[in-house]
Curated annotation (Swiss-Prot):
Protein EC: 6.1.1.15
KW Secreted (keyword) present: no
Principal place of residence: cytoplasm
Family to which the UniProt record says this protein belongs: Belongs to the class-II aminoacyl-tRNA synthetase family. ProS type 3 subfamily.
Gene Ontology biological-process entries: prolyl-tRNA aminoacylation
Localization of this protein: Cytoplasm
Protein name as catalogued: Proline--tRNA ligase
Catalyzed reactions: tRNA(Pro) + L-proline + ATP = L-prolyl-tRNA(Pro) + AMP + diphosphate
Length: 481
């Protein structure tokens, strides 16, 4: 029940954990750093998977599966890659009761094992582009874990593509980060900033990393998806060459891109409240709950509730009836608010007699009367669409209200305690590291979206917020998950 949840104002971190566990989304495992994704949480992941998988296939990608064990010699082939991931790796040293001749790494990501196969499959320009996605689990040995946001094992998808030239590879990088943006904004109702990572924040082994960054309700940033231009780095490491149209050998150009179950954590923190989970209808496996008020002729009320549910389900609106008598209607109202069901329909004998029902929205708690007529399904569908749009607009307004443009160091320090700060940066790793050391804020993204850049005059030259040196652009700073 909702009374188990600490308020956001009292303790935001505890609110998040309370909500995840009370809404039965996930729980702690007996395995250190790992979580159990419960049915309510996994249902959200399934909705995310279905939407994303459809978008991947629309852009020409196919699914495959590669081993979770990676030979140590493969990992060592890409020096920058292993340097970035070595501290997080889990290593298998024994199998079948014997010490292994070569250690096996449990995949922290799959570039190396996948490129060992791509080397065999790619011989000619006719074999390109190769556009493959994998749905899998990965392991990164995290020291400080939090359900969905940072766990030792998590679920994700990782796309790995090979191309004949750098231009096509870059087009793929941008195409896929825009797929993630579309998913975040149209399905998650979560506004994101699209852009490029700084050199210190980019993926280990990449030439460039692009990302989408979202603001959570505590003002912190969450990296919700990444798309990497790997150049020819992995192709050279695995000697993956192809014969060009001109008949000469060249190394292929590569990309990789991925999102994970951390998106569920982002979804929770972007929209939910002190009463529990708030879900955008497009990602709710159960969009409508009908709660019959069982007075008078109970079976007649039940029959009407089931008839409405059948009509809504036939219309593509996922609906169920809770006509159990173990708990009161009030208890059910609170329970389904906790679980984030977008719409609740209350239906009693008087409502049936008057040819109407009461419809309650989870996002605003607004109640309206809806007629029990032929247009009811369209009316409920319109309410669901309004909820989806309202959640996006509310989150966008929150981000705008908690974004500041800083021109002094004092403004900067105050701003990162509240949300995003847009400020000039001199482009050096040294200044970036100093800002992080002094404020815990990092460069989240160098925006590429023209509308966002224009809104905040990102190309305006100025003075670096920390060093005082000349700066050619502004970037987005924030504390982050």
């Amino acid at each position: 029940m909702a009374d188990k949840i600490t308020s956001r104002q009292q303790d935001y971190s505890q609110w998040y954990i309370d909500l995840v566990r009370s809404a039965k989304l996930a729980d702690y495992s007996d395995v250190r750093g790992c979580m159990v994704i419960r049915p309510n949480g996994y249902a959200i992941w399934e909705k995310m998977q279905a939407a994303l998988d459809g978008m991947f296939k629309e852009t020409g990608h196919v699914n495959a599966y590669f081993p979770m064990f990676i030979p140590e010699s493969f990992i060592a082939k890409e020096a920058e890659h292993i340097e970035g991931f070595a501290p997080e790796c889990a290593v298998v040293t024994h199998g079948g009761g014997e010490e292994l001749a070569e250690k096996l790494y449990v995949r922290p990501t799959s570039e190396t094992i996948i490129w060992s196969s791509y080397k065999k499959w790619i011989q000619s320009y006719r074999d390109l582009p190769l556009l493959i996605n994998q749905w899998a689990n990965v392991v990164r040995w995290e020291m400080r874990t939090r359900l969905f946001l940072r766990t030792t094992e998590f679920l994700w998808q990782e796309g790995h593509t090979a191309h004949a030239d750098p231009e096509e590879a870059q087009e793929e990088v941008i195409r896929m980060i825009n797929v993630y943006r579309t998913f975040a904004e149209e399905y998650m109702a979560m506004p994101v900033i699209v852009g490029k990572k700084s050199e210190s924040e980019k993926f280990a082994g990449a030439d460039a990393t692009y990302c989408i960054e979202a603001m959570m309700q505590d003002g912190k940033a969450l990296q919700a998806g990444t798309s990497h231009n790997l150049g020819q780095n992995f192709a050279k490491a695995f000697d993956c060459q192809f014969q060009t149209k001109e008949g000469v050998l060249d190394y292929v150009w590569a990309t990789s891109w991925g999102v994970s179950t951390r998106l569920i954590g982002a979804l929770i923190m972007a929209h939910s409240d002190d009463k529990g989970l708030v879900l955008p209808p497009k990602l709710a496996s159960r969009q409508v709950v009908i709660i019959p008020i069982l007075k008078g002729d109970k079976e007649e009320v039940r029959a009407h509730a089931r008839f409405i549910a059948k009509a809504l389900n036939k219309h593509g609106i996922s609906t169920f009836v809770d006509d159990s008598e173990n708990n009161s209607p009030g208890w059910k109202f609170a329970e389904y608010e906790l679980q984030g069901i977008p719409v609740r329909i209350e239906l009693g004998p008087r409502d049936i007699a008057e040819g109407k029902c009461i419809v309650a929205r989870r996002d605003t708690f607004e109640k309206t009367e809806v007629l029990l007529d032929a247009e009811m399904t369209e009316n409920i569908e319109e309410i669901l669409n309004n909820i989806q749009q309202n959640l996006y607009e509310r989150a966008l307004q929150f981000r705008q209200d908690n974004t500041v443009e800083a021109t002094t160091w004092e403004e900067f320090k105050a701003g990162v305690e509240k949300g995003f700060v847009i400020a000039h940066w001199d482009g050096t790793d040294e200044t970036e590291a100093l800002i992080k050391e002094e404020t815990k804020a990092t460069i989240r993204v160098m925006p590429t979206d023209e509308e966002y850049r224009k809104q905040y005059n990102m190309d305006e030259p100025g003075t670096c917020i920390r060093s005082g040196n000349p700066a050619t652009q502004k970037v987005v700073f924030a504390k982050a998950y």
